[in-house]
Amino acid sequence: MFGTLRIGSEKNSVEFIEHAKGEAASRLGGYVFSHSACESCRLKKLRCSGHKSGCDRCRSQAMKCSYQIGAPSNSSRPKSRSHFQPNFSNMSGTAGTSKAPSPLGNDGVDREIGGWEMAETDPTGSVVTTTAQFLNSVNQGEHSNLNDLRQGQRFGGELDYSENELNDIFSNIAYLQPDDMETNVFVGAANRAVLDAEAFDSMTEPANSMSDDIGDIAASQPPSADVQSAFMAFDHARTSSSSSSHQSSDTSASDAFIATDFDGARSRTDPSTCQCRGSILRVLAEIESNILSASPSNMYAILSYLRQTTAASNDILTCRICNCRLKFFGLLGIIGEKITSLSGAIITAFVCRLKEQNESVDFGKSDSPDKRLDPNRAIQLCEFQVQSLQEFKVVSAAVIKLQLKYSVAFVSRTRELAISMNHLAQAQSLEKLESRLNELVIKMQRMVSEVDSDLCDI
């Protein structure tokens, strides 16, 4: 097979389109796409050909949608390749080692990874970049704006709460009932309004250590210099508020991941300063290893990574100086899947750690409603310690539930973007992820409430 029949805009207008030649053909199996078909064309099993007439309902009109001929066979009848249904790499919610499917199918035809449109429209109208090519080219350092990325960033220690934040928590923790957790644990500036998932950007912005790579955030959620909350503790590298502003010039490149000038980031208007592509790469490069490494001993460190990953991904959705959310929409869907898996891994780690803490309780004081933890097993929070089992359960569960709400917000916004792009199949898959995250929220509430139950079974 050497070409594709294109059905023209006029009835009975059929043209023969040659396949791509040379390097592009070897990479994409002879099919070059720089186009995202509309849902109607997808349902009709239409694919784009090489003429720039364009379907007026498609996202990109650089290519014309037409019937695509399948691989050669004994039959002379043309065959249209069936649509590959959405299928994320791992919907089980557990840590896995499965790799993304190859962009080339057995028939040598370009295939969307997981059913997501992976084609990027090149601004020059030349050759498209598929997901596999993008990751490969970035890993080879072809993009200068990624040279200073710190790969495999790890966070050590426990949550770094400030003294005031801990006082607010601990002053409301004695004899606290699980049902009152959200109402009473986070007080002061971190009030109920901040707990709302829609306040995601304004709450996490002061601690969002990835914002320097992302740039502008939606104007609908302006920054608040007064917002201080326990969730700011997730920036492990900061030991004081002053260290979150400007870093010295000799360490600015390596510490850009940790410290950010947020005012400068929000004032950017030049698309060349956008680092969304780099942020997407960093998340994809690190998140799987964090899923695999989640354990009771590093539960807070992994939770910290999840918060920053969710914040960075959310900012990509709201960035106004680039359209990476459209070009790499499929990757955002994969990130949503991985965020769901990582959330499940964190809850599993919480359950195991809760059991460990329960076993370490000083049973000589078991009659006390505020059972004391073994001093050697107590949790260090900055210069303070969570010294009772109830303190550990309430604080940990509150923070995890709060993070789950932000993860739900990200997946929900990605689903809304899919609907706006007319990617209905992808929106349905994201809706399943959103439901899974909501189930995890319910499980967290139930685990905290069922004090005497077997917490190993989630």
UniProtKB/Swiss-Prot annotation:
Localization annotation: Nucleus
Keyword Metal-binding: yes
Keywords assigned by UniProt, alphabetized: DNA-binding, Metal-binding, Nucleus, Transcription, Transcription regulation, Zinc
Region (Disordered): 69-109
Keyword Metal-binding tagged: yes
Major place of residence: nucleus
GO cellular component, one term: nucleus
Function: Transcription factor that specifically regulates the expression of the gene cluster that mediates the biosynthesis of PR-toxin, a bicyclic sesquiterpene belonging to the eremophilane class and acting as a mycotoxin.
Protein name, entry field: Transcription factor ORF10
